[in-house]
Each structure stands twice: as C-alpha cells, then as structure tokens.
Amino acid sequence: MKIKPFKGVRPPKEYVEQVQSRPYDVLNSAEVRAEAEGNEKSLYHIIKPEIDFPEGTDEHDPKVYEKAAQNFQMFQDKGWLVQDGKERYYIYAQTMNGKTQYGLVVCAYVDDYMTGKIKKHELTRRDKEEDRMKHVRVNNANIEPVFFAYPDNKDVDAIVAKYTKGTPEYDYTAELDGFRHTFWIIDDDADIQRITELFAAMPAMYIADGHHRSAAAALVGAEKAKQNPNHRGDEEYNFFMAVCFPANQLTIIDYNRVVKDLNGLSDEEFLKKLSDDFIVEKKGAEIFKPSRLHEFSLYLGGNWYSLVAKPGTYNDNDPIGVLDVTISSNLILDKILGIKDLRSDKRIDFVGGIRGLGELKKRVDSGEMKVALALYPVSMKQLIDIADTGNIMPPKTTWFEPKLRSGLVIHKLS
C-alpha cells in the first residue's frame, strides 16, 4: 500500500474544541444549525455551509458549495486553521466506554483505490458521490478523512505506542457523547520513513466507513491528473486523507431494523410464518439482545422474541448468504413482509445500535412502527472476507462507533 505524510491544515490547540465537528452525514441541516449555533469557528460552516443561508436553502445549490470554499479560506485567514510547515503523519485515538482505538492519519494513494487494493464492501450512490466531489473540487482539499482498517502489524503498533506515551497535541472529551479524542504528531523522519515502508508491504487496506468520501476523493484526483498536461504522479491530488486503524481494534455494532406494518398479517399469522424458518421463543417484556450469530431479537405487541435461524436456511460457504442481514432480508423482510429493496422502501427504517434496543421499543410502542428486528453485529473478519472476495455487503449492515471527528486535520490537494 502506498501512503505518504502530508502538511496538515489544522486548528491551533486553543481552538480545536470549537472547530471540530461530527461528520457531515450523521446530522441533518436542522440538527447542524442547532449544534453550530453561536459558534463561528465550527467546521460545520465548511462541511454543511447551508447553515449560513436561510432555512430551506437547497444544500446542493452552487452558491452553498461556493460558501464552503469562502469559509475554508476565511478560517485560514483568521488563524483558526493553520498549515503545518512539514510533512507528517499523525495519530488519532478515540476512547469509548473505556476502550481506545489508535488510528494513523495518512494520505492514501488514489491509484490503490482505482485498482482495488483499497477494498470496498459497500455500493455507492452516484448522487452522493457527486455531492462530495463538488465539495472536494471547490475546497481543493479533503476536509474530512475516511476511515480505513489495515491488517494488524506489531511494528506499526510499536511506533504508535512510542508516541502515545508522550504529550498529545489535542486531548478533549466531546460534550455530546462523552467520547475522548486524542491527537499526536509524528515528526521524526526515521519514524515517518519506517511507517511508509511498513505500509508498502501490506497487501490491502479496507474502507470501514466513508465509501462516498473515498470514491469522491479518488475520482477528483483522477480528474485532476487528466487535466494536468505535466502530470507526474506524485502531486498532492494523487493522495487523499485517511485514518487507518488496525482491524483488531475496531468494533462494528449492531444495525437494526424497524418496519411500519406486517404486510396485512395479524401478529399471530406473522409469528406462525416466522416459525417456518426460525425457532421462535417468547421472552416477555424485558429487552432481549441477540448474543450470537443467526440469533435475532424481535419486538412486537409489547413482547420480545428470540428467533434462531434453522439449519438449512442459510449457506455457511457463501460469505454473503451466511450474514444475518441477508438471512433477515430474505426470510423475514422479503418473504413475509414484502420488502424487496431496503434502499428505497418507505416502510422500513434503520436504527444504529449506538441508540440501544430501547430506541426500537420506543418506536414500536409509539405506534410509528409495528415491529422491530435486532441483529447480532457483523464481525471485522466477516467484513474482510467479503471485501477480499470482491463481494458487497447488503445495505445498512455495518455501524462503526465511535465516528471520526472532522476538523482535527485537513489535507490540501495542492
């Protein structure tokens, strides 16, 4: 894998907590307005610039993208973002519930994405790619990083451990979620060279989160190469910013489903149909969480049920067919509830496990939804197997937590 250090554009220590933000795609415009209110230094003015226009302004209006570029320049003019004078790697650690994961902030190579060395597990939507491409073009920068996993490597771990014993550049706990974010600078030339060499020996990296940002960064890089008659291949636009974590440190949490109706069935008829493919056991009113693969938790009519897929209902040798999202999509959502397309069907919604199973109960008890289905989370091993075999995960399969904060460091393309 080809990586390189870069001259990060980042906030001085005293501004980092005001500048940093959550990623662009986890909040809607109204939520961002509320979160950025009264904070002129918030990165949201660059990644969600529609908040600087009257409510109801189309976030895809050309003037909104233009505003992002103006704000990015203004942040630099005012000294809220300052470019490092030297190419460096950085370390970004996140601590959630007492567990810490350590990521290396690097520039990944556009060609590695184009040739499939940077492996995907999700399909991207062209409209979302185009939105991010406009954002990269207008700012001439990767404002937000993507989230990669790499094969565990003790030599990389040792270099990271050496720096994380030292004083961090940033260290704060985010008010909203209580997660701790810590950031160190690697500026020793020998360590920088060693990290580059260690990654060069790796056969692959995996996109954990940020498929649209990765696609956009790579496509803009390829576009700039075409437009440059003197293209050499080592220009800054040939690279895009990623935070790379060892796969063994990452946790995927459950990504659950809620459905509006039972497709014309009564509760009893629905449960009877489920028993064709699942061993169904009523658990009662207390929240029940699945504890292993092929076990599901169902909430219906004030009761929780355990569902265990019967042998023969899935194929252990099929990396996609063996996934619980596939089993539940085929045997429950499609076969019984008539939901064919998870991306477009308005009867279904998805709830990240970070909200807890109480959120599923709440949405059913309120009458908004009729039934909830909780899944056992996908493992990193399953994700890597799927990416390695060139397969694609079904939609809404993986939820990584904690999410990367944006605004700790930015990569300029020239």
Residue ranges and their predicted role:
Residues M1-S414:
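Surface-exposed, charge/polar-rich loops and edge strands
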